[in-house]
């Protein structure tokens, strides 16, 4: 029974080491994942700021378009200044479209990274759920082992109580046998008198051996 309990304890220790190491690996992965998510959200914030800047540039450019149209309508006589302003306008328009092209490239790169991030995020949480399920199963097995060990302790305690009661019964029986032997000896000494006492002394080893055999037989039977 003792070797069985030792093997149970060793198995329980293995389950505990697995249950203890698994949350540690999971915690490291979670921390790394949270750091990646934090960095990605910072990039998202920067990209949103770029979107707002691009919108401001777009509205500014639209204002310039409206202003240019107003100049076309109001200054037909001032042809030369108009063409100078038109030249400047087309330069600004070229710069704007180049800026838009660059923005679209950044946008394309961003969304590509965005899709990759969410694929990795999905795979991460799938792995995390698998780890969590394994941890839950280990804890359930650990709980079952504890219940088995508790039942063994209860059974062992009952056996010890039975052994204790048996030992008390044996002790009581020995005391009764010793008292009976003393009464028998006193009886023979009292009824047979001196002669019987001498005869008992002569037969003492035989009677003593008989008493020892009786005691040994009684103890062996108990």
Swiss-Prot record:
The keyword Coiled coil applies. It comes from the Eukaryota. Residues 129-153 form a coiled coil. Keywords: Coiled coil, Transit peptide. One of its GO terms (cellular component) is plasma membrane. This is Coiled-coil domain-containing protein 70. The lineage of its organism: Eukaryota, Metazoa, Chordata, Craniata, Vertebrata.
């Amino acid at each position: 029974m003792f070797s069985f309990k030792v093997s149970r304890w060793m198995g329980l220790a293995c389950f505990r080491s697995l249950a203890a190491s698994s949350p540690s690996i999971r915690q490291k992965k979670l921390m790394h994942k949270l750091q990646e998510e934090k960095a990605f959200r910072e990039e998202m914030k920067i990209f949103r700021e770029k979107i707002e800047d691009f919108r401001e540039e777009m509205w500014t450019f639209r204002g310039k378009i409206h202003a240019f149209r107003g100049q076309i309508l109001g200054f037909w006589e001032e042809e030369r200044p108009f063409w100078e302003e038109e030249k400047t306008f087309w330069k600004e328009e070229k710069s704007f479209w180049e800026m838009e092209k660059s923005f679209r490239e950044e946008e394309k790169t961003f969304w590509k990274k965005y899709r990759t991030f969410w694929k990795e995020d999905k795979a991460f949480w799938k792995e995390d759920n698998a780890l969590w399920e394994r941890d839950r199963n280990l804890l359930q097995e650990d709980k079952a082992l504890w219940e088995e060990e508790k039942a063994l302790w209860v059974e062992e305690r009952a056996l010890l109580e039975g052994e204790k009661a048996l030992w008390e019964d044996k002790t009581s029986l020995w005391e009764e046998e010793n008292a009976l032997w003393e009464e028998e000896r006193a009886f023979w000494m009292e009824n047979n008198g001196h002669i019987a006492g001498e005869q008992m002394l002569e037969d003492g080893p035989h009677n003593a051996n008989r008493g020892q055999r009786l005691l040994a037989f009684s103890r062996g039977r108990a």
